[in-house]
Curated annotation (Swiss-Prot):
A GO CC annotation given for this chain: cytoplasm
Keyword Nucleotide-binding: yes
Family (UniProt): Belongs to the TRAFAC class translation factor GTPase superfamily. Classic translation factor GTPase family. EF-G/EF-2 subfamily.
Species name: Nitratidesulfovibrio vulgaris (strain DSM 19637 / Miyazaki F)
UniProt superkingdom: Bacteria
UniProt GO molecular function: GTP binding; GTPase activity; translation elongation factor activity
Protein name (record): Elongation factor G
InterPro entries assigned to the protein according to its UniProt record, in alphabetical order: EF-G-like_DII, EFG_II, EFG_III, EFG_III/V, EFG_IV, EFG_V, EFG_V-like, G_TR_CS
Record SMART domains: EFG_C, EFG_IV
Length: 691
C-alpha cells in the first residue's frame, strides 16, 4: 500500500497541561479550523468532541486520552488530548511514550501550575520536543511575560517567544509574529477563521525589535553558517529563522512560545502552523531501539520505514460496547494490515490482527493498512496488555515499556447483590487491564476486595464506570491510604524448608542478605557460585520473595525498596523442586525483614492552595494542623498560592473543609510526591487497626 501523505509531512502530537488551562478547548478549535468538526464543541456545554465519555461531559474534564486525526496545509496531524487532572497521570505517561512532539498549554493568569510541572517532567523523561501556547490571554490578570518567566524558574526550560500579545485581558486583540514581522488580528464574526495581517503597532515597535533580536540570537547558534552570517551583520531571512527554530526545537535546546485565547478563537491557526513548522515528523526523532528477547544484551534498532520488519507498542486498551476490545498501537517500523499474524514479544504469544481503525475521538474510520509512524486502533488483539510490543515473528524485539505509577489510595468494594458478584470480578479485571495505574487485590485476612488508584476522583470514576458500562452495582468503603513497608537495616536469613510425609518430600535451602534500597524498588542479585543451588531453582526463590513482599510483616502492606542477594544454599537430588524453593524464598524474606528494623511508609502529597489574601492565615494554620510543611508562597492577583507537602492520610475531606474555611473561594490541587516514614506513634495506631 502507498501512503497518501509522506512521512515527513506527518505529526504525532499530544496536547498537555494542568487541569483547566484550556487543553480540550484548544483541541476543539484545532478540529474546527482543520475541518474535522463543523460545529465548535464547548467544554462548559458538555459537548466537546474529544471529551466523549459521559463522565467527562458531566465533569468538564478529560479522563482518557482521546486520539484523533486531522489535516493542515498538506500535513496529517495525529492529536492526543491528555487529561490534566493528576489522578490520570498514567494517561499522560502513555501518550508521551508514543508521541513525537507536544503542545504544552498554560493559563496566562495562573502560569506554571503543579500539574504543568509533572507533565513537563514526564515529557523530559521521554525526550519529547514541545512548543508552548499561553492560553486565556483575554482573562483578567493575564500576563504573558510572567508566564514565560515561570517556565524558566519552575520548568528550567529555555522559552523563546515567537509571538507577542497585542493587548491583554479584555483588550487582547491579536498577536505580533516575531519571524514575519506582522501583526495578526482575528475576525470575531467568522469565529476567527478570517484574520488580517497588519504592520506592527507603533507603540509595540521597541518591544518587537528587542524580542526579535533575542529570538534570532537564540536560534542562530543552531547553524554555523547562519551564525557567521548574523555576526557579519547580515539579516537572516524568514526561511532561515524558521529552519533554525525547527532544528533548535527538535534538539530540545529551546521551547518556542505562542499565545492566544482558544475560547475566543484567537491564535489557534498560527499554533497549527507552528506544529507543522517546528515539531518533528516520525523521521526526525531518534530511531526506536529495543532488545532481542532471546538475548537481552543485543540491542535492535527499528528504523522508521514501512519496508522494515514490524515493531510497535500497545499504549492503551479500551473496551468499546459495539466493537469490543480496542488496542491503541504506535507503529515504529514496518507496517500492519488486517488479517496478518503478529508476535506479542512481551508474552511470546502470536495474535491475529482483526480490523484496523483510525480514530476521531469516539468516531472511527476503518482502514486496511497502516505504516511506520502511524497511531491506530487494532481490533482483535485479545491477549495484549498496555506496554506490550507487537512485532514480526521473524525479527522478535521488545521495546521499552511504560513507567506505571504506584497507586496511593485504596477502598474496599463489594457487590450489592449475589447477582453482581461474578459480574463485578469480570468488570474490575477488564478495567485493570485498560488502566495499569488501577489495581485490584484481595485482602486475605478480611476476605475483602480492595481497589487502588491515583486518587479519590480516579476511584470515583472507576465505580461510576462499573454502573454505567457494566451495569454492576457495588458498595464502596471509605478511602484508605496505601501504606508501604520497608527496612532500615541490613540482615541475613539462613532458611531451610524440609518436609517429609511419605513419598517424595520437599527440600529447599537458601541464604539471603537484604539491605535498604531507598527509591530504587526491589532488586534481586544472584550471587550463587559452584551450583550450590541449581540454575532452575533461582527464579522460584526470586518469585517466592516477591510474592511474600506483597504482604509485609508489620501490617500486611506491600514491602518496597529492598535489595536481596542470594548468597548460598543447598538442594536435594530427589526432594528439591521449584515449589520447595519458592516456599523457601518466601520464608527467608519474612525472616530477614523481621530482623531488619521494618518501618511503615506513607504517601506525602504536593499540595497547592490558591486562596484570597484574607483567608491566608486560616489556610496556613489548617495545613500545619495536618502535619503539613509549607514549601513556598507566591503572591498572585488578589490571592496567595501556598505550596506544601502534606501526608495523604491528613487530606481526606480537605475539599469540604477548605470550602467552609474560605466560603468556597479557595481552590487546591494535590499530587503524589514521595513516600516517607510514618512517625512512630501514628505507625503504632495504623498497625493496631490492621492487627
Amino acid at each position: 500500500m502507498s501512503r497518501t501523505v509522506p512521512l515527513e509531512r506527518q505529526r504525532n502530537i499530544g496536547i498537555m497541561a494542568h487541569i483547566d488551562a484550556g487543553k480540550t478547548t484548544t483541541t476543539e478549535r484545532i478540529l474546527y479550523y482543520t475541518g474535522v468538526s463543523h460545529k465548535i464543541g464547548e467544554v462548559h456545554d458538555g459537548a466537546a468532541t474529544m471529551d466523549w465519555m459521559e463522565q467527562e461531559q458531566e465533569r468538564g474534564i478529560t479522563i482518557t486520552s482521546a486520539a484523533t486525526t486531522c489535516s493542515w496545509k498538506d500535513h496529517t496531524i495525529n492529536i492526543i488530548d491528555t487529561p490534566g487532572h493528576v489522578d490520570f497521570t498514567i494517561e499522560v505517561e502513555r501518550s508521551l511514550r508514543v508521541l513525537d512532539g507536544a503542545v504544552a498549554v498554560f493559563d496566562a493568569v495562573a502560569g506554571v501550575e503543579p500539574q504543568s510541572e509533572t507533565v513537563w517532567r514526564q515529557a523530559n523523561r521521554y525526550g519529547v520536543p514541545r512548543i508552548c501556547f499561553v492560553n486565556k490571554m483575554d482573562r483578567i490578570g493575564a500576563n504573558f511575560f510572567r508566564c514565560v518567566d515561570m517556565m524558566v524558574e519552575r520548568l528550567r526550560a529555555k522559552p523563546i517567544p515567537i509571538q507577542l500579545p497585542i493587548g491583554s485581558e479584555d483588550k487582547f486583540e491579536g498577536v505580533v509574529d516575531l519571524i514575519s514581522g506582522k501583526a495578526i488580528k482575528f475576525d470575531k464574526s467568522s469565529k476567527g477563521v478570517e484574520f488580517t495581517e497588519e504592520d506592527v503597532p507603533a507603540d509595540m515597535m521597541d518591544l518587537y525589535l528587542e524580542k526579535r533580536l533575542a529570538l534570532v540570537e537564540a536560534v542562530a547558534e543552531e547553524d554555523e553558517a547562519l551564525l557567521e552570517k548574523y555576526l557579519g551583520g547580515e539579516e537572516l531571512t524568514e526561511e532561515e529563522i524558521i529552519s533554525c527554530v525547527r532544528k533548535a526545537t527538535i534538539a530540545r535546546n529551546i521551547v518556542p512560545v505562542f499565545c492566544g485565547s482558544a475560547f475566543r478563537n484567537m491564535g489557534v491557526q498560527p499554533l497549527l502552523d507552528a506544529v507543522v513548522a517546528f515539531l518533528p515528523s516520525p523521521l526526525d526523532i531518534e530511531q526506536m531501539k529495543g532488545m532481542n528477547p532471546d538475548n537481552e544484551e543485543e540491542t535492535i534498532v527499528c528504523p522508521c520505514s514501512d519496508k522494515e520488519p514490524l515493531a510497535g507498542l500497545v499504549f492503551k486498551l479500551f473496551s468499546d460496547p459495539y466493537i469490543g476490545h480496542l488496542s491503541f498501537f504506535r507503529i515504529y517500523s514496518g507496517f500492519i494490515e488486517s488479517g496478518m499474524t503478529v508476535l506479542n514479544s512481551t508474552t511470546g504469544k502470536k495474535e491475529r490482527v482483526g480490523r484496523l481503525l483510525r480514530m476521531h475521538a469516539n468516531k472511527r474510520e476503518e482502514i486496511k493498512w497502516a505504516g511506520a509512524g502511524d497511531i491506530v486502533a487494532v481490533v482483535g488483539l485479545k491477549q495484549a496488555s498496555t506496554g506490550d510490543t507487537m512485532c514480526d515473528e521473524k525479527r522478535p524485539v521488545v521495546l521499552e515499556s511504560l513507567d506505571i505509577p504506584e497507586p496511593v489510595i485504596e477502598v474496599a468494594i463489594e457487590p450489592k447483590t449475589k447477582a453482581d458478584r461474578d459480574a463485578l470480578s469480570a468488570a474490575l479485571a477488564k478495567l485493570a487491564k485498560e488502566d495499569p495505574s488501577f489495581r485490584v487485590k484481595g485482602d486475605e485476612e478480611t476476605g475483602q476486595t480492595l481497589i487502588a488508584g491515583m486518587g479519590e476522583l480516579h476511584l470515583e470514576i472507576i465505580v461510576d464506570r462499573l454502573t454505567r458500562e457494566f451495569s454492576v452495582n457495588a458498595n464502596v468503603g471509605k478511602p484508605q491510604v496505601a501504606y508501604r513497608e520497608t527496612i532500615t537495616a541490613s540482615s541475613k536469613s539462613d532458611m531451610k524448608h524440609v518436609k517429609q510425609s511419605g513419598g517424595r518430600g520437599q527440600y529447599g535451602h537458601a541464604v539471603i542478605e537484604i539491605e535498604p534500597n531507598p527509591g530504587k524498588g526491589y532488586e534481586f542479585v544472584n550471587a550463587i557460585t559452584g551450583g550450590v543451588i541449581p540454575k532452575e531453582y533461582i527464579a522460584p526463590v526470586d518469585k517466592g520473595i516477591q510474592d511474600a513482599m506483597k504482604s509485609g510483616v508489620l501490617a500486611g502492606f506491600p514491602t518496597v525498596d529492598i535489595k536481596v542477594t542470594l548468597v548460598f544454599g543447598s538442594y536435594h537430588d530427589v526432594d528439591s523442586s521449584e515449589q520447595a524453593f519458592y516456599v523457601t524464598g518466601s520464608m527467608a524474606i519474612k525472616d530477614a525483614v523481621h530482623k531488619a528494623s521494618p518501618v511503615l511508609l506513607e504517601p506525602i502529597m504536593d499540595v497547592e492552595v490558591v486562596t484570597p489574601d484574607e483567608y491566608l492565615g486560616d489556610v496556613m494554620g489548617d495545613l500545619n494542623g495536618r502535619r503539613g510543611r509549607v514549601q513556598n508562597m507566591e503572591a498572585r492577583v488578589g490571592s496567595q498560592a501556598v505550596r506544601a507537602q502534606v501526608p495523604l492520610s491528613e487530606m481526606f475531606g480537605y475539599a469540604t473543609d477548605l470550602r467552609s474555611k474560605t466560603q468556597g473561594r479557595a481552590t487546591f490541587t494535590m499530587q503524589f510526591h514521595h513516600y516517607e516514614r510514618v512517625p512512630a506513634q501514628l505507625a503504632e495506631e495504623v498497625i493496631k487497626k490492621k492487627g
